[in-house]
Regions:
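Short secondary-structure boundary micro-motifs
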Residues: 6-9, 69-70
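Generic detector of short, locally flexible boundary/turn motifs and exposed helical patches
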Residues: 9-15, 49-55, 100-106, 127
Length: 130
């Protein structure tokens, strides 16, 4: 199994152990990994958005996969005891090789806060609000 797939399986297990449902959502031009535990739709929801992950392998070399090796936001979401919790990965994180091939490295480097990225994460947040 490739490292990115191993990291995805590990993240899914972490989420499931906390009663969260792992899914991949289409948002804008991206596929976004999420983990959600929502017991009451009227409750406020605690939202954790992952950081940049492994954007760079060295100071001058871009990573081929931005999936974090230690997912801090996911770890916090899993430990949160609130009944409604959502974890949102950044674009291009936790994708298999085929989907990752469609994700340009600029989205985890120079364009990580571009309109396309912000729009995609906003779409996921909007879906959570419904």
């Amino acid at each position: 199994m490739l490292e990115s797939e191993q990291l995805m399986v590990l993240a899914q297990r972490q989420a499931h152990s906390a009663g969260m449902t792992w899914s991949l959502r289409e948002a804008g031009v991206f596929t976004i990994a999420t983990a959600i535990r929502r017991t009451n739709l009227s409750d406020r929801i605690h939202v954790y958005i992952e950081g940049d992950g492994r954007a760079w392998t060295t100071r001058s070399r871009l990573s081929t996969d931005p999936t974090p090796r230690r997912a801090t936001a996911l770890a916090l979401a899993v430990k949160d005891t609130h009944p409604s919790v959502a974890y949102i990965a950044r674009p291009c994180q936790y994708l298999g090789p085929a989907a990752l091939a469609d994700c340009a490295p600029q989205y985890w480097s120079s364009h990580r806060y571009s309109q396309a990225v912000i729009k995609a994460i906003s779409e996921v947040l909007d879906a959570l609000a419904k």
